[in-house]
Swiss-Prot record:
<dbReference type="Pfam" id="PF13516">
    <property type="entry name" value="LRR_6"/>
</dbReference>
<keyword id="KW-0132">Cell division</keyword>
<protein>
    <recommendedName>
        <fullName>Antagonist of mitotic exit network protein 1</fullName>
    </recommendedName>
</protein>
<dbReference type="GO" id="GO:0005634">
    <property type="term" value="C:nucleus"/>
</dbReference>
<keyword id="KW-0963">Cytoplasm</keyword>
<keyword id="KW-0498">Mitosis</keyword>
<dbReference type="GO" id="GO:0005737">
    <property type="term" value="C:cytoplasm"/>
</dbReference>
<dbReference type="GO" id="GO:0051301">
    <property type="term" value="P:cell division"/>
</dbReference>
<keyword id="KW-0131">Cell cycle</keyword>
<dbReference type="InterPro" id="IPR006553">
    <property type="entry name" value="Leu-rich_rpt_Cys-con_subtyp"/>
</dbReference>
<dbReference type="GO" id="GO:0031146">
    <property type="term" value="P:SCF-dependent proteasomal ubiquitin-dependent protein catabolic process"/>
</dbReference>
<keyword id="KW-0539">Nucleus</keyword>
<feature type="compositionally biased region" description="Basic and acidic residues">
    <location>
        <begin position="17"/>
        <end position="34"/>
    </location>
</feature>
<comment type="function">
    <text>Negative regulator of the mitotic exit network (MEN), required for multiple cell cycle checkpoints. Required for daughter cell separation and chromosome stability. Involved in copper sensitivity.</text>
</comment>
<dbReference type="GO" id="GO:0019005">
    <property type="term" value="C:SCF ubiquitin ligase complex"/>
</dbReference>
<comment type="similarity">
    <text>Belongs to the AMN1 family.</text>
</comment>
<dbReference type="InterPro" id="IPR001611">
    <property type="entry name" value="Leu-rich_rpt"/>
</dbReference>
Length: 511
């Protein structure tokens, strides 16, 4: 309580009736004019925690929450509540009070649907005091928000890429090929999941403020309309910032977001051809950078940002056709922790060659490499085999026109990729020897590694024929071994008889 004597000094004796009357009037004015916190129509509602009372609008506050339910808490939690929430006048009661059902002074009719919604949102006054501790509520909200992070629009890697034609689908899936092909042609999609965290905004003021903080940890926009209508806080410090397929948004529209990169670990502009992340977003904490389909990212930009993100682990630069060996060489120099690199493209593949990829292979901790459509040669495969072969897990070589049997077939024959699980070799027209690829698949299956080899329709047909030929050879050898084992006794008797005759002949010569 405020010290009224200090705020309003008075020379009137305290024992006089005039003094008591003036003090009562001043105390009433303080209560009537005390500033209220700004609240929305639903945040100022039933059972919202309050730290003050204000005249007639809050005269329906119930008595302070009892501490009788603290017995089930640990001593540390009980001490935390008591030190923060106890009232100086009543040590056995909590300071925080709850509103009884709110009745508006407005005489205008209220929608029955709104009344029903408010009734559903009602919370019992006897709620456990543990839900008033911000630290515990924050842990609960992070647990609830775990599913909410799945709503971030990302491109999920398919189990295998869709077939290129009906015949290709039948080669891969057999009798189910026609159904798979029809599913590939369809455009059906599932409805996006609803966010659980948004329901937590409607609990009370404490939950509302903490939920806003959790929601600000992951900023993502999958439409231009949502981005234009976003009202950011004064400064947002998210862990992830994702823009997904924004075609109309301009670069100047991003200046109003006020992103603080102090916590930023994931930065993604997926198919946003006109947008370029600001340089201040790149810090040593950034681990994932995804910029596919950009028409503004070039070598100069990569050379500027590469020294700023030494801890980068995931880099996706697919279809960035203005990037050449110069930009990728800077990435290989300043980002040694990269495990996943995808710089595949459909056009201008000659701009990315062995000069930059070999430098990245030598300096980075690669586990996944995608160079589809690039002008790499067989030398890159040998470099991968001897430097990163023991840890490589995924390799995409689609449409690499310079690759031959001297690279893929020879390296696989030597078993230099013991952990490789995904190999993409679509549209490699210069491949002739496919037996090493089939043997590689069987070798990985014996290691209990589920291997996936993605090939085009022509290569898939040849691989299936090679698999049948190899299976026939294996079955023939098995049959020969069984026959030899069954006839092994007769053969052993013949050998022993021949050895005996030779021994007798030698003895006769000696005699």
């Amino acid at each position: 309580m405020w010290d009224l004597a200090q705020q309003y000094p008075d020379t009137t004796p305290e024992s006089s009736p005039l003094h008591e009357t003036r003090a009562r009037e001043r105390r009433s004015s303080l209560v009537d004019h005390r500033p209220l916190k700004r609240a929305s129509s639903l945040s100022f509602r039933i059972h919202t925690p309050c730290d003050y009372s204000s005249g007639a609008s809050m005269t329906s506050c119930t008595s302070s929450t009892s501490l009788s339910s603290l017995g089930s808490l640990s001593s540390s939690a009980r001490q935390l509540i008591m030190s923060r929430k106890t009232s100086p006048r009543h040590p056995t009661r909590l300071k925080t009070r709850f509103f009884s059902p709110f009745h508006s002074t407005n005489t205008s009719p209220v929608s029955p649907r709104l009344l029903e919604t408010v009734e559903k949102l009602s919370i019992d006054n006897d709620a456990h005091p543990i839900f008033e501790i911000p630290e515990i509520v924050n842990l609960i909200l992070h647990y609830v928000g775990h599913d909410d992070r799945e709503r971030v629009p990302t491109e999920h890697a398919p189990v295998r890429k869709p077939p290129m034609s009906l015949n290709h689908a039948k080669l891969i899936h057999g009798e189910q090929g026609e159904k798979v092909w029809q599913r590939t042609l369809s455009t059906s999609s599932t409805a996006p999941p609803t966010g659980n965290l948004h329901n937590c905004l409607l609990v009370n003021k404490l939950w509302h403020s903490l939920t806003l903080e959790v929601l600000q940890e992951n900023l993502y926009f999958d439409s231009d309309f949502k981005l234009m209508n976003y009202s950011p806080p004064r400064i947002a410090a998210p862990k992830s910032f994702v823009l997904h397929k924004l075609k109309s948004t301009q670069q100047r529209d991003l200046a109003n977001l006020h992103i603080n990169p102090v916590n930023l670990e994931w930065l993604e502009f997926y198919i946003c051809p006109k947008l370029l992340p600001s340089l201040h977003l790149y810090t040593a904490k950034l681990k994932k950078l995804v910029l596919p389909g950009s028409k503004v990212v070039d070598d100069v930009y990569l050379q500027q940002i590469a020294p700023l993100m030494p801890n980068l682990v995931h880099l996706d630069l697919r279809a960035c056709e203005h990037i050449t060996d110069a930009g990728l060489y800077a990435i290989g120099t300043h980002c040694p922790k990269i495990e996943t690199l995808n710089c595949g493209r459909h056009t201008k593949g000659i701009l990315v060659t062995d000069a930059s990829i070999s430098h990245i292979v030598a300096n980075c901790n690669l586990k996944t490499l995608g160079v589809a459509g690039c002008g790499v040669s067989d030398a890159i495969l040998w470099s991968l085999a001897y430097q990163k072969g023991h840890q490589l897990e995924r390799l995409s070589l689609n449409s690499c026109w310079r690759l031959t049997d001297a690279g893929i077939s020879s390296v696989l024959m030597m078993d230099r990729f013991p952990r490789l699980a995904v190999l993409e070799i679509r549209r490699l027209t210069r491949l002739q020897q496919l037996r090493p690829i089939v043997e590689f698949k069987k070798r990985q299956m014996r290691r209990k590694i589920a291997v996936l080899v993605e090939a085009c329709e022509e290569l898939e047909a040849r691989l299936r024929a090679e698999e049948r030929s190899l299976d026939l050879e294996i079955s023939t050898r098995i049959f020969e071994d069984i026959s030899e084992w069954l006839n092994g006794d007769d053969l052993q008797d013949q050998i022993e008889e021949r050895n005996l005759q030779q021994f007798v002949q030698r003895r006769s010569v000696l005699v």
